[in-house]
């Protein structure tokens, strides 16, 4: 089963010398987990940051199994906020919250739209109040 989608990186863990296991929340497929080969190369490693938006090509052998992912950066989101610890903490907090609260392969467009809204909220002046409302919507 092959498909293409866009999604946000929720987590990434080193798998072996050249690969990583990554978890994404996608628009049409929900939360997915897969292996990214060559993720330790300088080219890919530099943008595999939690919160960045990717274009994902997935190759699954069977439904419910760990698949192979090819990723291309779509939008760089997180590095913009590296100098602001509060905003960076809120991004990572939201990603972990979604990682914990959602089930694999269950599509929920509302959650994806909340992730899109998160990065719009963080740019506002009163972002902290809006972030609290966003958090309540996620829960």
Residue ranges and their predicted role:
Residues 1-20, 25-139:
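Non-catalytic alpha-helical scaffolds and adjoining flexible linkers that form interface surfaces
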